[in-house]
């Protein structure tokens, strides 16, 4: 059955090869002949635990990929982060060619699965599905990128291409401050013309031209305190917990229907005495049912598609916070996380080019996917500087949880898509 499915995958591209250039056909033929080697590279990387905080594991995956890229003529560097960030660093592979646009290819070495978390080795579940830690997010995508580059080398095209392949070591849990963790990443991206990221694909027919940004907010409420028998009176007021509840519910009423905007209070503490450990996201509260609460503390996130949407939402939230209940006072402060990857004209033009590519390959149309289906990613840090696309990696289900899977039927086609697309962009 597996052989039959691979044959069908070959036919999907073979039937329209007349519309492809000779180097594109050579790259596709290489992938058909070497899909087993690509799968073995995937298995080897999945079977190395590389949770973000497992520094040795992240570096081991980096060494595995570096060996493959070095064979292709890439210059290999390891970019160390400051010791204070407690992260492994990043793998950077550079190939200098003679012509064409300079491509910035993005992967990441780490996964969410730390050594003490439930996750498993690469395991084939059936003829179309395999599972394993990070198998699609994003070791599957890393191998898509590397195998596509191998195919272009075999087709005699890589020698002319200008490529930086950048694999971050802390995408899932960036070192802090984030500006330090991504300084080198941003600087190198700004020397390039186009960025392509190999995060999980959502099937064969969509790609990410936009990703929502992420930011945080902190709400602090203080209030008069006293015996609960006097709550709601002019002298005592409503208390901090009621004020926090009013604010959160008004956020929900006024902002929850706006497309691509989400906000989530993930942590709340209130009572007579409140202690917060922001570093470990923990809190303690003490209170009694007959005491009006004088303090409440809430933290949450805010996700948005554009900077304008973010700022408009923040202004509404400030206005809501300012309308305090009697006897209370509230303040809200905001923190920036990852910016949005906005659906710019340059990104949409890349979608059109990819759509032409997949049509020529016989895969069918490719459209821009729903930005609301994705959170922020490494590409968000550089999206303001150059045209970019994401979601060019492996497809599957269940990312970030035990049982994460990869779709083995779509995998060869996604590698071919990447190879032909990179070839066309580099012309």
Regions found by a protein language model. Give the residues of each.
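Acidic/histidine-rich catalytic neighborhood of metal-dependent amide-processing enzymes
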Residues: 138-214, 270-280, 426-427
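Bacterial Sec-dependent N-terminal signal peptides
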Residues: 1-23
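Short glycine/proline-enriched loop/turn "hinge" motifs that connect secondary-structure elements
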Residues: 34, 113-115, 157, 209-213, ...
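Extracytoplasmic/secreted envelope proteins and their assembly/folding machinery
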Residues: 39-43, 62, 66, 142, ...
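Alpha-helical metal-binding/catalytic segments enriched in His/Glu/Asp
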Residues: 105, 126-176, 217-221, 232-254, ...
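Acidic/His- and Gly-rich active-site-bordering loop/insert found
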Residues: 19-133, 153-158
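Short, flexible, mixed-charge acidic loops at enzyme active sites
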Residues: 114-124, 210-215, 278-283
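Metal-dependent amide/peptide-bond hydrolase catalytic core
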Residues: 19-26, 51, 68, 84, ...
């Amino acid at each position: 059955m597996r052989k039959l499915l691979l044959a069908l995958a070959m036919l999907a591209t073979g039937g329209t090869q007349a519309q492809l250039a000779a180097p594109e056909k050579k790259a596709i033929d290489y992938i058909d002949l070497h899909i087993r080697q690509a799968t073995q590279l995937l298995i080897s990387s999945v079977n190395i635990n590389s949770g973000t905080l497992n520094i040795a594991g992240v570096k081991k995956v980096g060494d595995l990929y570096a060996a493959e890229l070095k064979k292709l003529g890439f210059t290999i560097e390891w970019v160390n982060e400051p010791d204070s960030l407690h992260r492994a660093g990043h793998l950077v592979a550079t190939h200098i060619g003679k012509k064409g646009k300079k491509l910035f290819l993005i992967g990441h070495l780490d996964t969410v699965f730390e050594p003490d978390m439930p996750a498993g080795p690469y395991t084939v579940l059936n003829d179309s599905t395999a599972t394993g830690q990070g198998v699609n997010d994003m070791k599957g995508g890393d191998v898509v990128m590397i195998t596509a580059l191998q195919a272009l080398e075999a087709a005699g095209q890589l020698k002319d291409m200008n490529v930086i392949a950048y694999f971050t070591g802390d995408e899932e849990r960036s070192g802090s401050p984030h500006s330090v963790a991504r300084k080198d990443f941003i600087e190198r991206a700004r020397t390039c013309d186009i960025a392509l990221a190999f995060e999980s694909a959502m099937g064969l027919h969509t790609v990410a031209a936009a990703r929502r940004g992420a930011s945080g907010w902190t709400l602090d409420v203080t209030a008069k305190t006293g015996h609960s028998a006097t709550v709601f009176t002019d002298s005592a007021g409503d208390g901090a917990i009621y004020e926090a509840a009013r604010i959160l519910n008004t956020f929900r009423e006024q902002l929850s229907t706006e497309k691509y905007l989400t906000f989530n209070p993930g942590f709340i503490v209130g009572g007579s005495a409140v202690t917060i450990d922001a570093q470990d996201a923990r809190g303690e509260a003490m209170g009694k049912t007959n005491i009006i609460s004088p303090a409440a503390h809430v933290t949450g996130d805010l996700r948005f598609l554009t900077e304008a949407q973010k700022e408009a939402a923040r202004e509404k939230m400030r206005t809501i916070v300012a309308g305090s209940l009697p006897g209370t006072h509230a303040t809200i402060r905001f923190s920036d996380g990852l910016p949005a990857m906005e659906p710019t004209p340059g990104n949409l033009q890349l979608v059109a080019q990819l759509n032409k590519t997949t049509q020529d390959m016989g895969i069918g149309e490719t459209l821009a996917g729903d930005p609301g289906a994705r959170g922020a990613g490494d590409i968000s840090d550089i999206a303001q500087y150059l045209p970019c696309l994401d979601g060019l990696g492996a497809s599957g289900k269940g990312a970030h949880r035990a049982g994460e899977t990869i779709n083995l039927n779509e995998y060869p086609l996604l590698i071919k898509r990447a190879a032909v697309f990179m070839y066309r962009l580099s012309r």
